[in-house]
A protein has these predicted regions:
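Bacterial Sec-pathway N-terminal export signals of envelope proteins
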Residues: 16-85, 258-286, 336-337
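Periplasmic alpha-helical coiled-coil/stalk elements that build and connect Gram-negative outer-membrane
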Residues: 137, 146, 152-269, 378, ...
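Small/polar, glycine/serine/threonine/aspartate-rich low-complexity segments that form flexible
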Residues: 36-54, 63, 101-126, 249-266, ...
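Sec-dependent N-terminal signal peptides
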Residues: 4-12
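Short segments within alpha-helical structural elements
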Residues: 191, 220-248, 382, 390-449
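Amphipathic alpha-helical coiled-coil segments and their boundaries
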Residues: 68, 75, 130, 137, ...
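Transmembrane beta-barrel architecture of outer-membrane proteins
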Residues: 58-60, 120-122, 168, 213, ...
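Small/polar (Gly/Ser/Thr/Ala-rich) solvent-exposed segments
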Residues: 73, 93-117, 128-157, 177-179, ...
Length: 456
């Protein structure tokens, strides 16, 4: 009884020693994720992505990505692989059962006249079971579980990132389309102005300078179109790659037709952010795997006790084979004798590996809060910027209308009209970019809060 108590005490100390040396992460959560935003349990990340991105064409692209993206399929296969490996480790708890049989025929006194023949027949079942006194198998199983969960959470994080990447590329593509429409329409206006300037010059109404100015404006606008078309095609190829398809034309809406699904900033509680972000959960499981690896290294310093059981039949001929049962049991104790500190060094190294992983986990948490704060700043700024750009565009349009009227009345020169046209073109493009940035800021906020991987 005393020996049993001593053994149990040693086992308990083994587990405590590992947990004592594997220090918990130093994480102190703030009262609010963002100081300027009141803490609330409601969070935009809890909304399914299909309710955020309501455009059917964008939804189709996201669904294709979730079904066909090669990185996501690779991650899924990896999760399934680790699930199978976990079953292998779990099987170490069970006894290993085997079977063997043989027929042995020996001839003795080969050079003599009285040769003898010996026949031996056997059929046996074997059973080997390791008694996990010091938790070696238990720690190995914990490591396998943690690695599996780490990969599963990593798959969720990848899905979250891919949804954000597809949506971002989609809005960038729509913004490029809109910019191309603006410039194409401006080019038509420049062509009309060039025709009018040519007629005035040829009719002797003006000098050649206004005509040349009109040509410069037309050419400087026309040269923008090929560059935009190139950007559009490259962006389409980028989206096709994300969806797991060959380069193709991407069906999309017009950016001015799109409406945000939300108009309030709901960012939730700090504690919920830790739970919601799959990349943080993945880092946590990675930390647990390192602890389990340290526990395994600790258990490796102690003896392994294996019980071997063998039973069956063995005889010198077939006639009495089933009347000759055979059984025996062996308890095998294997222990390191002289390792010259190798196992202790391996355990110490595993502890240091845990510490390094702990610092990475703490960094991941800090990074998550930083990303949310940056996303909130960007979202607020982008909304204000879009409002200001709308006002700027309206003012530039009014300026252009007045300049055209005054030029017709001979009150200002043609160069003043050109200046007003440039201001309006720039204002239109800047507004288009501001609307794009507003949508992208929402996507980044949604992603930083951990939205996108949740199932309906």
């Amino acid at each position: 009884m005393k020996h049993l108590i001593l053994l149990l005490s040693i086992i308990a100390c083994c587990s405590c020693s590992v947990r004592k040396r594997c220090v918990e992460p130093d994480i102190t959560l703030p009262d609010q994720i963002v100081a300027e935003v009141d803490a609330d349990s409601t969070c935009v990340a809890d909304i399914h992505w299909a309710e955020i991105f309501t455009d059917p064409l964008l939804q189709n692209l996201i669904n294709k990505t979730l079904e066909q993206n090669k990185d996501l399929l690779t991650a899924s296969a990896r999760v399934q692989e680790l699930a199978k490996l976990h079953r292998m480790v779990k099987a170490d708890y069970a006894p290993a059962i085997g079977a063997n049989g043989y027929i042995e025929h020996e001839t003795h006194n080969l050079t003599a006249d009285d040769q003898t023949l010996d026949l031996e027949v056997a059929a046996k079942l074997t059973l080997a079971w390791e008694v996990d006194f010091f938790g070696r198998i238990r720690w190995a199983q914990k490591e396998a579980i943690a690695n599996y969960l780490k990969t599963a959470e990593g798959q969720k994080a990848l899905q979250m990132t891919l949804i954000a990447d597809v949506a971002t590329a989609y809005f960038e593509l729509m913004a490029l389309d809109n910019e191309l429409d603006i410039i194409s329409h401006t080019l038509e206006t420049r062509q009309e102005d060039l025709n009018k300037a040519r007629l005035r010059f040829e009719g002797g109404m003006t000098s050649e300078i206004p005509y040349q100015q009109a040509q410069v404006e037309y050419a400087s606008t026309a040269v923008l179109i090929p560059a935009l078309q190139r950007k559009i095609e490259i962006k389409e190829n980028e989206i096709a790659l994300l969806t797991g398809e060959m380069p193709t034309t991407i069906n999309r809406s017009k950016i001015h037709e799109y409406q945000l699904a939300i108009d309030t900033m709901m960012i939730g509680l700090p504690s919920d952010l830790i739970k919601r972000r799959p990349d943080i959960s993945s880092a946590e499981q990675s930390l647990k795997a390192k602890m389990a690896k340290a526990g395994y290294a600790w258990a490796e310093q102690f003896p392994r006790f294996v019980i071997n059981l063998e039973g069956g039949f063995e005889d010198y001929d077939f006639t009495g084979f089933f009347n000759a049962p055979l059984t025996y049991t062996i308890g095998e104790l294997t222990a390191p004798l002289f390792a010259f500190g190798k196992r202790k060094a391996k355990y110490d190294a595993a502890i240091k590996a845990y510490d390094a992983e702990r610092y990475q986990y703490e960094k991941k948490v800090l990074q998550a809060f930083s990303e949310v704060n940056n996303a909130v700043i960007s979202y607020s700024s982008a909304n204000k910027q879009a409002e200001l750009m709308e006002n700027l565009k309206n003012a530039a349009k009014k300026y252009l209308d007045l300049a055209q009227v005054q030029h017709i009345n001979g009150q200002i020169n043609y160069i003043d009209v050109l200046d007003a046209q440039r201001s309006y073109l720039n204002a239109e493009i800047d507004l288009s970019d501001a609307i794009r940035d507003k949508y992208i800021a929402l996507i980044e906020l949604y992603k930083s809060l951990g939205g996108g991987w949740q199932k309906e």
